Regions:
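Short acidic/glycine- and proline-prone juxtamembrane loop motifs at membrane-interface regions
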Residues: 49-51, 167-174, 412-413
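Membrane-lumen/periplasm interface segments of specific transmembrane helices
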Residues: 242-342, 346-347, 351-366, 405-408, ...
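Aromatic/acidic, Gly/Pro-rich catalytic loop(s) in extracytoplasmic/lumenal soluble domains
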Residues: 553-558, 562-682
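Perimembrane helix-loop-helix junctions
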Residues: 184-241, 253-292, 376-381, 425, ...
């Protein structure tokens, strides 16, 4: 008996529906969901990228609290390239709640919420709640198409992207939720439209075949009773798209495929043609206008381009409005601007970022797409997903955004985290031993009867992939949640305590090396930009008493010389103006030996001692040297006193190596020259 292969993904929506909804136990998912919440409260001290603070918390906190903040260049009023509305919702709303709760918690419990922990926690709780919306959308899509939602929810929730990235105040995390929302509403419209179109085509056929006028009237009335479907959820989809574009203009890459699939629903039928396609496109644009106008007005008012006085006097022109996505495109169109952020090869997303973010799942996705391209080149069209199917939607939503974003030479892993959603839907069953409908292949016998065959890989092979998935995500979750630049936030908490405990007139100076920028909003520095009025109606401004010098990856000799000059200036200022000071230097433990050596060679300049240690702290910019890591040498060498000494030496090397993954805070003290010391003693 010969069998003709028929691709499972080319079936209609009715073929996916089960006779009765399958209820699956998802206890493991709830455990992972609880873990996501617990890690949000922990809190995660890992520092993924400066943008999680400097494009959200640092921008908004100054609008809600009387503190000094340093808004990044993206929010410069002269040429803003980021919209303010989304950060005001994601961070501003939690901060408004925090501000109102703080007096009550202090009154009833003696606990103030004006601490770095709560400044970080409240926005992250909001983001954590948003992240669960994407879980819900994944569940609904699986349920709608009769798919195994358990295996997908567990895979989705166990990804370190959801445990770390999704709960941070990154615009990319919001992009992930918006992409999931688009896919849900589009897939719902596709399922609904396919049913209506099939019924419409069936009734049209019966109408044309009707022998009598009575039958034609009957089928005509039945067609008229069919519900409308062409413009379903149009306003919702348009609004989500506009929000996504004003959040990150790169959202166009993620919205392109879902919106295209929504526009071309039913195009292979007799009742839907290009006229419907163009009508949908026109109405979609119209539905997006209210949201676009709203965002433009909000940004124009916030950045000072538009005022109520100008509106009252009708002095309004085109220059009174700012469109931040347009400014964003203008900025990124210039390669010279991207050079300051770092230029990368165009294949970085495919070769590095996808495996890094999605590990096993990403590799499976890339291999599957490669097979599809091979099938397309061989004109094996039945091996490709049907354009009208949910699998076609998810496949193109995975690959097209990555291709479009690869055009830009600046590529970071976080740029493509929204493709986790389609990846999980498509390939999560590959990691599980539980069969899923979307990996069933159907064959048609010579007599026309269909048979189903479920190719199940060997359990051992699948269990290896599943084990690799869990282990890699566990390690990466720990790395990004606690280890990567993990000493920065504890350092901020320490400096905040130091600023509150110091004498009133004392100035604090802080140098940092090989670490990300400290979010100054968390330090709650007193506002030096605001003009205050005294009780006698005198105007005054506060003096800046905290000074930060971020040295980045500058060579330590340069940093050493800068510290020497700074402490000399501070000492002279203390002698002349009687302004006391404290000077600190934060650097990775892997750099302390070099700094100590520089200090010993220039012992007449200053001295230092260790104040605090923050662990773990992994700085990719200054990893410990492997030359001091003599494990292999000790294991392969046999000493006179036996192998036990080699094991002890190896353990000591490992301990010393791990100990270098710390952030050290040094206090720098001025060293009075001997000649001056002698004069003082006399």
């Amino acid at each position: 008996m010969s069998l003709k292969h028929k691709n499972e993904y080319r079936r209609s929506i009715d073929d996916y529906q089960t006779a009765a909804p399958v209820q699956r136990r998802i206890g493991l998912y709830w455990i992972l969901a609880t873990l996501r919440i617990v890690l949000t409260f922990a809190p995660q001290t890992g520092y993924i990228h400066p943008d999680e603070f400097f494009q959200s918390i640092e921008v908004v906190s100054g609008d809600h609290f009387d503190i000094d903040v340093y808004k990044p260049w993206e929010f410069n009023a002269t040429f803003p390239i980021r919209s303010m509305f989304v950060p005001q919702v994601v961070v501003g709303l939690p901060y408004a709640i925090l501000k109102r709760l703080s007096p009550y918690t202090f009154y009833f419990f003696g606990m103030s919420l004006r601490k770095p922990y709560f400044f970080v926690l409240f926005p992250r709780l909001f983001m954590c709640a948003l992240s669960f919306l994407s879980d819900y959308f994944l569940y609904k899509i699986c349920y709608m198409y009769g798919q195994n939602y358990r295996v997908r929810l567990v895979t989705y929730a166990s990804s370190y992207v959801m445990l770390t990235y999704a709960t941070r105040t990154l615009s990319n995390s919001i992009e992930l939720v918006l992409t999931a929302a688009l896919l849900y509403f589009v897939s719902r419209c596709m399922a609904y439209s396919e049913k209506v179109v099939l019924q419409n085509d069936y009734l049209s056929k019966k109408y044309s075949e009707a022998a009598t006028a009575v039958e034609r009237v009957k089928y005509y009335k039945l067609r008229a009773l069919l519900p409308s479907h062409s413009l379903n959820d149009c306003f919702v989809l348009a609004t989500i798209t506009v929000i996504g574009i004003f959040n990150r203009p790169t959202f166009v890459a993620f919205a392109f495929v879902p919106i295209f699939f929504w526009l071309q629903r039913g195009m292979n039928s007799k009742s839907v043609g290009f006229r419907d396609f163009h009508i949908r496109m026109f109405v979609f644009v119209l539905c997006g206008l209210p949201a676009a106008i709203f965002f433009i007005l909000v940004d124009s008012f916030y950045f000072g381009y538009l005022t109520m006085a100008e509106i009252g006097q009708l002095e309004i022109g085109i220059n009174n409005f700012v469109v931040t996505p347009v400014n964003f495109l203008k900025y990124n169109a210039d390669t010279k601007n991207l050079e300051s952020h770092g230029l990368h090869p165009h294949f970085l997303h495919f070769l590095v970022n996808i495996p890094l973010l999605f590990n096993v799942l990403g590799v499976i996705g890339l291999l599957t797409v490669a097979k599809m391209i091979h099938s397309g080149l061989k004109a094996q069209w039945l091996h490709l997903p049907r354009l009208q199917s949910i699998v076609g939607l998810m496949t193109f939503t995975f690959i097209i955004p990555v291709v479009l974003l690869s055009v830009f030479p600046h590529q970071e892993p976080r740029f493509i985290i929204p493709v986790l959603f389609p990846l999980v839907f498509l390939y999560a069953p590959e990691l599980s031993q539980v069969p899923s409908l979307d990996i069933v292949r159907r064959y048609v016998n010579d007599d026309g009867n269909s048979e189903t065959y479920s190719p199940v890989e060997p359990t051992k092979h699948k269990s290896r992939k599943l084990m690799l998935w869990y282990i890699s995500n566990l390690l990466l979750a720990f790395f990004y949640a606690f280890a990567h630049q993990g000493g920065v936030l504890p350092l901020v908490s320490h400096i905040t305590t130091e600023l509150k405990a110091k004498p009133h007139l004392t100035h604090v100076h802080l140098y940092t090396s090989y670490s990300y920028s400290l979010p100054t909003a968390l330090l709650q520095l007193r506002n030096t930009r605001r003009i205050y009025r005294s009780s006698s109606n005198h105007k005054y401004k506060l003096t800046q008493d905290f000074h930060m010098y971020e040295q980045g990856s500058k060579p330590l000799p340069w940093v050493f010389d800068s510290i020497a000059r700074r402490i000399k200036d501070c000492e002279e200022n203390f002698v002349v103006n009687r302004i006391p000071y404290r000077l600190y230097y934060a650097l990775p433990a892997s750099a302390i030996n070099e700094f100590t050596e520089l200090s010993s060679n220039n012992s007449h300049l200053f001295r230092f001692h260790l104040v605090n240690t923050f662990y773990p702290h992994i700085s990719i910019e200054k990893l410990p040297s492997l030359r001091s890591f003599g494990v292999l040498e000790h294991l392969l060498s046999f000493r006179d006193d036996g192998i036990f000494s080699s094991i002890v030496a190896t353990a000591k090397d490992v301990y010393e190596y791990v100990e270098q993954f710390r952030l050290l805070l040094l206090k720098i003290e001025y060293l009075v020259p001997e000649s001056k010391q002698n004069r003082l003693n006399k």
